[in-house]
From Swiss-Prot:
The keyword Transferase applies. Gene3D superfamilies: Hexapeptide repeat proteins (2.160.10.10). Belongs to the transferase hexapeptide repeat family. It comes from Salmonella dublin (strain CT_02021853). This is Carnitine operon protein CaiE. It holds the Pfam family Hexapep. Keywords: Repeat, Transferase. Residues 180-198 have a biased composition (Basic and acidic residues). Pathway: Amine and polyamine metabolism; carnitine metabolism. It comes from the Bacteria. The keyword Translocase does not apply. One of its GO terms (molecular function) is transferase activity. Residues 174-198 are annotated as: Disordered. Overproduction of CaiE stimulates the activity of CaiB and CaiD.
Amino acid sequence: MSYYAFEGLIPVVHPDAFVHPSAVLIGDVIVGAGVYIGPLASLRGDYGRLILEAGSNLQDGCIMHGYCDTDTIVHENGHIGHGAILHGCVVGRDALVGMNSVIMDGAVIGEESIVAAMSFVKAGFQGEARQLLVGSPARVLRQVTDQELHWKRLNTKEYQDLAIRCRTGLSETKPLTQAEENRPRLKGTTDVKPKSAQ
């Protein structure tokens, strides 16, 4: 793991969290219990404070940053998809930010909301609970359904379990030169399926 103190502030990581060795945490970063931080994530707490609350995840290639005297927060069970950028914003409890989305300064994503992949949420947006946000700039399309929220929660549970699995089952290795016969497949811990299979 790449942890850096910045002007006396040292990142704080709960012992039950998993931070991939290629992720970078700088300065004023606080990571809660059961959090998963994926490969190549960058958390630059060199201006504002960055907080990932318990059970949340920040996947591969995500960026968190913010201005001085601001907090960038992912609340409990928040789910941040691959490549998303969070800058000086707040993501509510149990909300999902889709892959490659950008959430700008002062924006608030309401609890149990979903931001669709590739969306751009403008600075200062003030969301409410259970909104489905889509587009660039993002607009409220409708309310999140119970089925969508269930799907989101299953995915978040997978990442909470992945944090545990990675702490015990991930190790650096050298590759094989060819696939072994009857190579096993990995399994998740829930019955979650991609949306295309629903």
